[in-house]
Amino acid sequence: MDRVEKHDLKIDAGLHRFLVDEAMPGTGIDPEHFFAALSALVHDLAPKNRALLARRDELQAKLDAWYREHGAPVDLDAYQAFLKEIGYLLPEGPDFSVSTANVDAEIATIAGPQLVVPVMNARYALNAANARWGSLYDALYGTDAIPDADGGTRGRSYNPARGAKVIAWARDFLDASVPLAAGRWSDVGGLAIDGTALSLTLTNGTKTTLRNPAQFAGYSGSAEAPSQIVLRQNNLHVVIVLDATTPIGQADPAGISDIILESAITTIMDCEDSVAAVDAEDKVVVYRNWLGLMKGDLAEEVAKGGRTFTRKLNADRVFTRPNGETLTLPGRALMLVRNVGHLMTNPAILDRDGREVPEGLMDAMVTALIALHDIGANGRRANSRAGSMYVVKPKMHGPEEVAFACEIFSHVEAALGLPENTIKMGIMDEERRTTVNLKECIRAARDRVVFINTGFLDRTGDEIHTSMEAGPMIRKGDMKQAAWIGAYENWNVDIGLECGLSGRAQIGKGMWAMPDLMAAMLEQKIAHPKAGANTAWVPSPTAATLHATHYHRVDVAEVQAGLGSRPRARLADILSVPVAARPNWTEEEIQRELDNNAQGILGYVVRWVDEGVGCSKVPDINNVGLMEDRATLRISAQHMANWLHHGIVSKVQIVETMKRMAEIVDRQNAGDPSYVPMAGRLEQSIAFQAALDLVLKGREQPNGYTEPVLHRRRLELKAKQRAS
């Protein structure tokens, strides 16, 4: 690997070229200044980074010893006393409110869906950024949100019977969201602008208007024959498209051809769990796509339906307000960027002692440099109109680590000439030590925090690893009913509201991981806004459009105001360990659990290691497509490692299960021309060996993380490919 030496750093030549030739021009940042500042950041803060990781290991060793002696805690007072004694559970300070300034409305006041997308994939990133608006008709027609029964089947050509069901669903939605003063939306035969009001004519000739006239926000076209009508509910916009020249509009009494919903309000461009970036070559792909998003020039050639077109970022949408002034609505989701956590290093840059630099330090400096194209002195202000950069910081353990992230951001701001606290922080509440000390974690970032989010997948992985020695864990499918998880979800909202996040920041909930099951999502995911979350994760732009309907039905600000008076969730419940009281499962139940875990692990790992794909829709054992990333992998691997450690299963049984499941995963991937089967070459398959490592060496992995094994094995495969 060719390297360029700058200020005691040895930088991969390709990364250096990208930074100097592509990222820096237009920012006002001099290359020598940048590399000197990066070197200072690395050499000042890397030792502290390593010390924090050593502290994680020290606490885990003490927990392991305690559990080996006591088993799962029965006397919770004694358990809490122990956690306080070792510095795991910290004293809680006085009440306070966060004071984060210059926060965009998309985060502070608009409640709605949030997408998370691998920024390594330009097409996915563009789709996610453009998912601010989505067709409700398309989202309903193309998914199981509308049942196939009674002639409503999806086919290759348009099915009018299904279309009628879609239109009926959408009209019912309008009745609930923007009701009329008289009549129903299904009876509307015409729309026009009368002065500053929306006038609707029903099919029986009756004139009506909106029950709440203030919900009329704007229009395009002429007042007599508008082409679009903009309505508003709970800070979210609905665009009714009027076009009688289209087949749908022609058949509609009012000429309505579509209903467009404001959908993904925010999108996290992910450099972490959904990507496979193990070296400088990969990191340049990550950073180049982020650069394209910040400069607004990211584009991708897309082939669809026999034609090729260029996908790029959508422009803002411009309408006329009822009073005749211009209404401009953002055309794109507000973009946050998720940097990696504190754990991993990356060979892209070496320090003065030849050590790989902490990847989180590199991400902070480079993603912020690139953000100057949006928020710098000459920035476009096309993403953040408030002039802020939003960084989601994952996998932090406790307030010391949050404070360290703030210190990193302060260094970066000083280096890049940004005012203090320009870089805002999203705190992923996905590690047990952060959960139990959440108030102090928020306090450590009180001037930066814009987001707390329950990541129940990683949080479950940490729950298993933290209490690995306590006994065999309950089955994975039972985990959602365990006492700790409900308390954890409520605690996050309770603490967030106590710390004044309402109206200032996002309180988020986790991912709907079944992108094909939209009817179930429509039924179940409304629980998130009802629980006081003003955002929640969805797996696709289509899911964002459907989930947006929940925020029309639920006024989250009102819910949060009501929750402020409830008692806080119980810490004792959060600290309860999900060990099986009577691990008397049948052999069939044990094998089914193993099959399910092994199949999920292999289905994800084979694409990660062999193809560098960090986020996949992996068919489960029942062929239901599940969105898998490193968080779901962490749970499955740790669960198998736990059962192995406690003798529920044997090593022989695990290896035999993995071999059988490899054949199933091979069959599930038979249609992928780039797929390399594992069966028949298990010893040679680096992906299969990685999957075995994750389970058989699961107890040894730091906090149960999968990154060390995945990175090592992916680098091994890339080296093998280069050698051949």
Swiss-Prot record:
Tell me which cofactor or cofactors this protein depends on.
Mg(2+)
Q: Name one GO cellular component term.
A: cytosol
Its pathway? Answer: Carbohydrate metabolism; glyoxylate cycle; (S)-malate from isocitrate: step 2/2
Please tell me which top-level EC class this enzyme sits in: transferase
Extract one GO BP annotation from the record.
glyoxylate catabolic process
Quick one: which residues bind acetyl-CoA?
V116, R123, Y124, S274, R311, P539
State the signal peptide span.
none
Keyword Cell cycle listed? The answer is no
TM ranges: none
Query: CDD domains recorded for this chain?
Result: malate_synt_G
Where, in this chain's numbering, is Mg(2+) bound?
Answer: E430, D458
Keyword list, A-Z: Cytoplasm, Glyoxylate bypass, Magnesium, Metal-binding, Oxidation, Transferase, Tricarboxylic acid cycle
Statement: the UniProt record of this protein carries the keyword Acyltransferase: no
Cysteine sulfenic acid (-SOH) carried by residues: C615
What biological function has been recorded for the protein in this entry?
Involved in the glycolate utilization. Catalyzes the condensation and subsequent hydrolysis of acetyl-coenzyme A (acetyl-CoA) and glyoxylate to form malate and CoA.
Checking NCBIfam families in the record gives: malate_syn_G, PRK02999.1
**Family per similarity comment:** Belongs to the malate synthase family. GlcB subfamily.
State the protein's name: Malate synthase G
Gene (UniProt): glcB
